Amino acid sequence: MNYDLTDQLQLGVSRTQDDHETEGFDLTSVSAQYKLDENTRINVSSGSMAHENNDPEGRAYSINGERLWVDGSRTELRWARAEAGFDNPSAGISAAREEMRLGHEQMLARDFSVEVEGIRSKQLDGTEEQNSLGVIGEKRIGATALRGGVRGIEQKDAQGSEDFGTYILGADRGLNLLGKPFQIGAEYEQAFNDTSRRRIAADADMQL
């Protein structure tokens, strides 16, 4: 539920309950969005999650700033933190983790852009830490977007640190399903020197 307090300030409140004996949860969140101008906005949110199986309750917080530029380019800065008991898969951050992300997508042509993204992520209940810097190009052909790029990753834990590089391939396609906008996408990432170290992701989104 969202409330427009002024032309610049919007507040949101939500609650989701699942009464399943072992997987159930009670999730509440509060968010605020402030528009500095037509192209700049700041989002702040806080949520809490309780579990039906009496696992510890957890909280999560996030701050996000976004700037849209005249040529269609975009800059985004995001900080998020989730306690161990906040394991909501749609939160955008894993439980017991803190992350900082800075990204800039530069439009080089009407149908081609390059994104530079830096991420710093650390485990709250351990010593694991990961830092990465990636460059990804995207080419749009009608309703299809093709992506390719590289990423450098540094991983640290109590045993030491490791550096490696990956390549990224992905695609998205916009469709019309039952009269509603529908989008599907997939992405594949693999380390250059280790074929067993890879990531495969797929998603679908439909506006109701």
What is each PLM-predicted segment?
Residues 1-208:
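Gram-negative and organellar
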